[in-house]
Every structure is written in structure tokens, then in C-alpha cells.
Amino acid sequence: LKAFKRVCKKTPLRMLLRGQNLLGYTPYPDDVVEKFVTKAAEDGMDVFLIFDGLNDIRNCACAAKAALKAGKRVEGNIQFTSSPVHTVESFVQTAKDYVNIGATAVHLEDMGGMIDPTTAAKTVAAVKKAVNVPVHYHSHCTGGMTEITYWEVARAGADVLDVDVSAFALGTSHPAAESI
């Protein structure tokens, strides 16, 4: 990280942080989370994109607080999925919760590429209406609908779409930047 920051002096570095699980699948106590985030910030991390696999903000609050204390930016990452309890309203509430703990942007992440374009667009529009921060949309091409979903979420107001250059795109990756 220090080597990257020495070379990328003007480029903000962002990491994906699994809340209380940090970089793995084991939950850590608050003091370990605080020290990890503090050290990452000291070594050059600028933006902490924080999520919990169950969208439980309580598992993100400690990391967010530590990042803000270190003077760094926090972005909230909502795990977008489909189930009876994962509704537009639940995603809106999660977005509000992230903003309440200091997030300056909200990401909707469909890691499986399985959310249909209409549902994704309705969710983006509702989140945009509910929070006054940029809304990012992130998906993979696994399900075959991501390019049209990106079209619909862009029309619904998404501020940022995650893409890759064509050599690294499609399949289980993101859509190609050139086609979006």
C-alpha cells in the first residue's frame, strides 16, 4: 500500500472492506477493526468502501467511525439481492443508514448479475430520491442482463457505473466500458 501511494500520489486509493470481517470471513472485535482501518489510512488508503454481507449496518459502523476519525472518506456498499425481505424499501433504508454513519456515496452491488433491469432501475431511482449522495451501480455480466440493466439504471439516475476495459470485461466481470 505504501509503495502504491508513493507512485499514485494524486490518485485516491479505495478499498473494499467487509465491515467487522475486515478482509475475510471472520468477525473481529472493535479494537482490531479500529487499528486496521487506522493503519490502512496512515499507509495511504483514502476511501473505505464498507459493506456487510447481510446489509447489517451495525457491522459497518465501527469501521466507518474509524475511517472518518482518520480523516478519510466512507462509502456504503449495499448488497443487492432478491428475496421477500430485500425490497426497494429495505434498500432505501440501508442507504439512509449508511449516510447516517457518514457515507458520502452509496453503492448498489449486484454481485451475481441477477437483478432484472426494471427492479434495479426502481431501486436506483428510490435511493436517489432518498439520499443526497452519489449512487453507484455495480454488477457482473454473469446473468446476461447487465448491459441492459446499466442502461436502465443510468436512465434512473445512477451517478456511476462500474465497468472494465474490453480485454477484462464480460463473463463474470463487468460490462465493457467501450460498449457502455
What are these regions (language model features)?
Residues 161-170:
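Short acidic/histidine-rich active-site segments
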